[in-house]
Amino acid sequence: MAKQRLQQVADTMQRILGEVIQTELKDPRVGFASVTKVEVSADLQHAKVYISIMGTPEERATTMAALQRARGFLRKRVAEEMRHMRFIPELHLIEDTSIDYSLHINDVIRQIQHERMVNPPRIDDEQ
């Protein structure tokens, strides 16, 4: 299948899933979660859905477990919105930790900048 078509399907699924998670899921265990990316297999049988979750590790685990239990509902809602597709991919939910990693890198950079301000590097006059 053409890459452009796969990307269109992935983008549409990302939009639908993001809206459904934010507005239609009534499970109180689902915290603040957003769909960051969807990758669809070439045969449209599988879709990796990357989800970013804010909160403590326990809250993130609880939210991810609740979303896993809601996979059937999520897939059904995608099917209702994408009626033109013959098959709807099986959803594989994956926690996206790239935002956490980038926040960690920013913290490390800030710490290094702070240390350089407090203890500037010495330049020896003698060479």
Curated annotation (Swiss-Prot):
One Gene Ontology biological process: maturation of SSU-rRNA
Keywords: Cytoplasm, Ribosome biogenesis
SUPFAM superfamilies: Ribosome-binding factor A, RbfA
Localization in the cell: Cytoplasm
Main subcellular localisation: cytoplasm
Single GO molecular function: ribosomal small subunit binding
A cellular component annotation (GO) from this entry: cytosol
Source organism, top-level taxon: Bacteria
UniProt similarity note: Belongs to the RbfA family.
Subunit structure: Monomer. Binds 30S ribosomal subunits, but not 50S ribosomal subunits or 70S ribosomes.
Entry protein name: Ribosome-binding factor A
Taxonomic source organism: Chloroflexus aggregans (strain MD-66 / DSM 9485)
